[in-house]
C-alpha cells in the first residue's frame, strides 16, 4: 500500500510539473531584494515577525535576457523580443503608425506592446526620484535593467522633468480620464508607475497639450492572456501564470503593515486548506487586471467576473472599487521606504484644481482603472485632503488585499498519519522558487532517526541534507548551486512517517 501511495505521489508531482512548464504567461520577479518597514530599509524579518511576507521574501522567475547583438533583446521568460535602443519621443498616433515601417535585425513584424507586455520588463529595484533637486542622473536608479536596455531620463534642457520617461503601450483605456480625454496606458520607467496618458491633443484650440512618450517595440507570440478557473472553493487559479488567488478580498481597508498581518493570519487559519498565501508583488497583481473593464463602461472593477471586489464609497461619495496593496515597496529618494505599490481596480482618482490656482478642486479619474501608483504605508489620509502629486492622486492608505499562492506548491503526503505538520513535518521552504540556495524548515516532536533528502523529478536521490537524531524546530540551507534548474522533491522521514514538498530551482 505504501508503495502504491508513493507512486501516486510521483504521478501527482509529475502532473504539477507539467502544469508548471505549460504556463503561457510567465510573470518574472520584480527584482526587489531589500526589506522595509513603514519608513526605511530593515534586515529581513523572520516568520511571525512584523513585516514578514513582503516582496523580497519571495523569489519568482528571475529576469533573464539575451542580448542578440543586433539591436534586439530576447526575454528568456516571456519569449518576447524587444528593441534595445531608446526611440525618439512621439505621439500615440505616431507610435501606432510608425511601427508599420519599422524594421530591425531583419524582422518587420514588430508591434507596440500591450501594457502587460511593457510592464513585464519593469524592475522594482528602481528608486523614484520624484522631488529630487539634483541634475546628475548617474546618481539615479531607474525601474528597468540598464545593463540590458538603453534608457534615458527626461530632458530638463527641453523643459521636461527628469521623471518624464514614459513609454507608450497599445492598451487604450476603455473609459476616459480627466474631462473625457481619450487615454492610452503607459509605463514610466523613471518613477515606476502605470498611468493613463492623453492619446489625443487636449486643451483649447491653439493651446493644446500634446503628449509625447518613448516607444520600445516588441515582437513574438501574444503575452499576458489569463486562463482563469473557478475552483469552486473560494479560489481562482490562473492556468496561464500558475498562480492561485482568493476569489474575494479583505473586505476592509488596511494599512500596509496590517495587510501583511492579515495574510499571515490567513495562513495561520489554513485558509481554504492552504498555509502559504502571500501578498502579491506588483507584477503578479497587475497580471490579473482586465483592461477591457472599468467602473464607467462595465459597471465593475477592472477584473474578470470570476472575482469579487468590495464596493467602496470614494472621496466624492460615489460607489467605486478599491486600490489593492502589493508586497512591493515603492522606494523613493526623498522618503526611502515610506510608500508601497498598489494597483487601482477602480478609478485612479485625483483632485485637479480647475482652473489652475482657482482653489476649485474636482475629483476625476486621472489615470484610469488598472493604473499602478503608490500610497504611504501608514498615516492619516486626512493629511492629504487634495491628494498628492501633479494630478492630486488620492491618498487612502487603508487599501484592500487579495492574496495569492503558487498553484503548484500543494503539500504531498504519503500516509494518513501526517495530519499535524506543526509537530512533525516540513514547513514551506523559502524562497520558493529559488536560485542556488533555499532554507528548508521542519519540525519534530520527539527524538528519533530523521532523514531529510532531496530527489529530482525522476525519483533519483540527489542529496541527503540531514541524517541523524534531532528534536524540535529546525532550519537547514540547501545549496543547490551544483544542480540544474528544475523541480525537486524534499522528503522528510522519521520512522514510518514521511512528509514531502516540491520546490523549484531557477537559475
Language-model features, listed with the residues they occupy:
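Short, compositionally biased serine/threonine- and acidic-rich segments at solvent-exposed termini, linkers
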Residues: 410-416
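Short hydrophobic/aromatic segments of transmembrane alpha-helices and their interfaces
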Residues: 4-5, 268, 418-420
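Glycine-aromatic-enriched surface loops/turns that form tight recognition elements
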Residues: 21-111, 115-277, 283-410
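C-terminal outer-membrane/trafficking sorting elements
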Residues: 418-430, 434-507
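Compositionally biased non-globular segments, especially hydrophobic aliphatic-rich helices
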Residues: 17-22, 144, 150, 187, ...
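Bacterial N-terminal signal peptides that target proteins for export
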Residues: 1-9
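Bacterial N-terminal signal peptides
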Residues: 9-18
